[in-house]
Amino acid sequence: AKNELVDKVVKATELAKQMAPDVMIDGEMQADAALVASVGASKAPGSPVAGKANVLIFPSLEVGNISYKLVQRIAGIEAVGPVLQGMAAPINDLSRGCSVSDIVNLVAITVNQAAAK
């Protein structure tokens, strides 16, 4: 697909590959190709991560937020995030619908981010 959001992911992938050449990074690819081996083999043959991706990068905060909330609610799992990276200081965002557990988890991550600075 060709659009502005896809172009953002392509550029981010290229930049990430330059910054971390020893890390297996690939993209842009659809979520099913990134997560399901049989789909990855047909949609992204030759990709080192197709079907076994452990990090997904979204083109915007909004898209990432929608995606993680869908997975959290449909699968009935505990999800922590969104975790923001690349800021001058540790900062993360809590949803108005978050639980006490969500707050504790994200505070712990933010404290670890601050300690690493």
Report the location of each language-model feature:
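Alpha-helix capping and helix-loop boundary segments enriched in small/acidic/polar residues
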Residues: 3-4, 44, 94-98
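C-terminal functional extensions of proteins
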Residues: 11, 15, 37, 62, ...
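Glycine-rich anion/phosphate-binding loop at the beta-strand->alpha-helix junction
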Residues: 30-32, 49-52, 62, 76
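Glycine-rich, charged/polar anion/phosphate-binding loops
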Residues: 37-45
